[in-house]
Amino acid sequence: MARYIGPKAKLSRREGTDLFLKSARRSIADKSKFDTKPGQHGRTSGQRTSDFGLQLREKQKVKRMYGVLEKQFRRYFEAADKKKGNTGANLLSLLESRLDNVVYRMGFGSTRSEARQLVSHKAITVNGQSVNIPSYMVKVGDVVAVREKSKKQARIVEALQLAGQVGFPAWVEVSADKAEGTFKKSPDRDEFGADINESLIVELYSR
């Protein structure tokens, strides 16, 4: 299955929530469209979705939010299920530890897609070493930085300025001037307010 390259706002509208696929500079008018499905004019009550449909839709939403395809997403779930603690929370913690997501959380990219490009184009280092694998798992204490020759890229400068206005998550410590940050700890479930019901995903894979 190929990665989706179509209009990103369409995916958010399909899921009925902001998947954070576009910059935070999106207008309020754009965000108000999320409760209208693609191709749908005005609000309709529609038919009641089955439990399986709800579970499947939640999985699709999270996959799209983090830019992960099915095979890899399944591996994350299996790894989360083997760890101690809540499987759903473990799954989200693993997704949050991906390098492309950490780059996004540190504000080097304004979206996860942009952060993934920065990683793939070798603009990012981990502990001083270039890493170009978006799925690389960042560990507690790792220092993630923008390579020196990439620090003046307009999109990185703008993304950091925007992130500075919005604020950084508690689990990363960022030096905007140096364009580097430290992954302080794995985030607790209640530390990021994403509109996710991970229990539905656990139920789906437990069928």
Swiss-Prot record:
In the record, what terms sit under GO molecular function?
rRNA binding; structural constituent of ribosome
Q: Which Gene3D superfamilies match?
A: Ribosomal Protein S4 Delta 41, Chain A, domain 1, RNA-binding S4 domain
InterPro entries, per database record: Ribosomal_uS4, Ribosomal_uS4_bac-type, Ribosomal_uS4_CS, Ribosomal_uS4_N, S4_RNA-bd, S4_RNA-bd_sf
Disordered, as annotated region? 30-53
Composition-biased stretches, type Polar residues, lie in 42-52
Q: Which UniProt keywords apply?
A: Ribonucleoprotein, Ribosomal protein, RNA-binding, rRNA-binding
User: Its Gene Ontology biological processes?
Assistant: ribosomal small subunit biogenesis; translation
Q: So what does this one do?
A: One of the primary rRNA binding proteins, it binds directly to 16S rRNA where it nucleates assembly of the body of the 30S subunit.
What is the protein named? Small ribosomal subunit protein uS4
Species assigned in the record? Delftia acidovorans (strain DSM 14801 / SPH-1)
